[in-house]
Structure formats: structure tokens, C-alpha cells
């Protein structure tokens, strides 16, 4: 594929959403990874309020709902995603406490201090990692959790081809230590961070895209823009297979401080489970 249109933002957003409408996931992840991230979160009850921001069609949301108490609101700007989200919630008999709404990440339909947990898998980049951290914090209760997966560099140096691709697609991509520092600056306490395994890309993201491309090609025969989008998806997969040692996704779990907490003796603002500056893909989930 030519590098002339090698960023996803070069395509019409409605066409992108239409492509992903027939996929359970719109980015790397897996049920196992969702549950691993959930394992770091305490104190959820039947009264807890959870928001999944940029929920897409809701694959990860349904996993959350089957394993966590509370009421969950999935939010996405694309109505087609929300239609499928709510249909799946009904099919899985979860609609009494799981609902999808059409909305924007930069105008959340929640009150300040209302949420016990904000979840976002592979979607915070739409608003920007730092902006999302700072703007979403006010919606969390004191002691509430934030759990997001985000694209990161695993190394300080990388080949020009993959560096240029990602800097064009998402200028905020950065190393794990720098992301953790951003979490601190936004006023959270880091709880955990782990790298998503390669199967989250190969088996749970790229493999289902083959079927999605078949359906998409049948819907848009001879459409050059649709063909370009499918070529982009194949190029993205090619890049990952060539350069997966240099980048990937990390799940970050953090907590909004509660003023009522009593600090433990010797505690510092940097306490908590955070990856070291030498974190590598091998530190990820298994």
C-alpha cells in the first residue's frame, strides 16, 4: 500500500464505523484482558455506576456486565454501534442494567462525582490521552477507578516506517513511563499497568477483520474509497507483524484519590503497581 493515505483519519469516519459494525471489537483486546483489568478494581456493588466510553459495538462491555455488578452505560458517537450494543444487551438478558447511548466523549451525560468506574478500551485516543484523563476525572467519585487501554512505544528508538506511521496516526503515542507520569499529573493514583499480549491483535482483532472485509466489499463493490480503507487495514496488519516488538497496547488502571483515606506510614505519591522504565512486551498479560 502506498504511504500517501496511511493514517486512519484520512478516511470518512462514517465509512470507518460502517466497516467495523460487523465486528465484536474495534481494536486490540480480548475477554481475558478485560477480566484481568477488572481484577484490579475493588468495591463494585449492585449500586455502582459504570461508564464504557467509546464502547463501539460493546464486546468488552458485555464481558464486564457478565462479571461485574452495577449498572453500565456504554457511550459512542456512532448510532449503528449503539443499535448493535443494545440488541446484544437484550439478547444476553443484560438490558435491565446495561444500556448504550449515543454521545460524545467531550460532552459526557453524567454528573460530577457520579461514576464508580470509567472504562475505555482502545478509545481514549479519540479525545487524547491527557485530555481524557483530565476531563473525565471530575465524573468519578472519590476513590473511583479509571481503566483504559492505550497505544504505547515499548522502546525509545524504532524503525522510521513504524515511527512515522504512528506519529501521523496518533501523535500522543508515548512510552509506558511517560504515560504513567501523565496519569500522576492528572491527579490519579496508578494501580496497575500491563501489556496486552499479541493474541489481542492477531486473534481477536486482525483475524475477524478478514470476514469484515468480505462483507464490506460486497456492500461497496467497486468503491475506491472503501477499497482504500480495506487496503489500510491490511497495511496496519502488515506493520504489526513486522514491528510488534516496538509498540502495542497497555491497560492502565488508576484511581481518583479519596480525601478520607489515611496515608500509610512511608507512603509516597508514586506508590502503586506501575511498570518500570524498562517495561517490555514480556511484562504483559498471559
Q: Where are the regions that the model predicts?
A:
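Short alpha-helix
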Residues: 172-187
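A short glycine-rich, Lys/Arg-flanked "PGG" loop and its adjoining helix->strand segment in the class I
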Residues: 131-145
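A short SAM/SAH-binding and catalytic strip from SAM-dependent methyltransferases
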Residues: 117-130
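Short, glycine-/aromatic-enriched active-site segment of Class I SAM-dependent methyltransferases
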Residues: 151-170
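Conserved alpha-helix/loop element of class I SAM-dependent methyltransferases that forms part
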Residues: 27-46
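Conserved Class I S-adenosyl-L-methionine
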Residues: 192-264
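Class I SAM-dependent methyltransferase SAM/SAH-binding core
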Residues: 51-53, 57-107
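A short acidic, Gly/Pro-enriched loop at the edge of an enzyme's catalytic core
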Residues: 106-117
Amino acid at each position: 500500500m502506498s504511504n500517501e493515505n496511511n493514517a486512519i483519519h484520512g478516511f470518512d469516519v462514517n465509512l470507518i464505523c460502517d466497516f467495523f459494525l460487523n465486528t465484536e471489537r474495534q481494536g486490540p483486546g480480548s475477554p481475558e484482558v478485560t477480566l484481568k483489568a477488572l481484577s484490579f478494581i475493588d468495591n463494585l456493588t449492585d449500586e455502582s455506576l459504570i461508564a464504557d466510553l467509546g464502547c463501539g459495538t460493546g464486546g468488552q462491555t458485555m464481558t464486564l456486565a457478565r462479571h461485574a455488578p452495577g449498572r453500565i452505560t456504554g457511550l459512542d458517537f456512532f448510532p449503528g454501534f449503539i443499535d448493535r450494543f443494545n440488541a446484544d444487551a437484550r439478547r444476553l438478558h443484560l438490558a435491565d442494567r446495561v444500556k448504550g447511548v449515543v454521545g460524545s466523549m467531550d460532552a459526557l451525560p453524567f454528573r460530577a462525582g457520579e461514576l464508580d468506574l470509567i472504562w475505555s478500551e482502545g478509545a481514549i485516543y479519540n479525545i487524547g490521552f491527557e485530555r481524557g484523563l483530565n476531563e473525565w476525572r471530575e465524573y468519578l467519585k472519590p476513590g473511583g477507578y479509571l481503566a483504559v487501554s492505550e497505544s504505547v512505544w515499548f522502546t525509545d528508538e524504532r524503525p522510521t516506517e513504524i515511527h512515522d506511521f504512528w506519529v501521523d496516526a496518533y501523535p500522543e503515542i508515548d512510552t509506558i513511563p511517560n504515560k504513567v507520569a501523565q496519569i500522576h499529573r492528572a491527579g490519579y493514583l496508578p494501580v496497575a499497568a500491563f501489556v496486552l499480549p499479541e493474541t489481542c491483535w492477531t486473534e481477536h482483532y486482525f483475524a475477524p477483520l478478514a470476514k469484515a472485509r468480505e462483507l464490506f466489499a460486497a456492500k461497496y463493490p467497486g468503491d475506491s474509497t472503501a477499497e482504500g480503507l480495506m487496503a489500510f487495514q491490511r497495511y496496519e496488519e502488515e506493520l504489526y507483524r513486522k514491528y510488534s516488538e516496538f509498540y502495542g497496547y497497555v491497560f492502565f488502571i488508576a484511581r481518583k484519590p479519596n480525601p478520607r483515606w489515611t496515608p500509610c506510614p512511608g507512603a509516597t505519591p508514586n506508590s502503586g503497581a506501575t511498570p518500570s522504565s524498562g517495561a517490555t512486551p514480556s511484562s504483559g498479560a498471559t
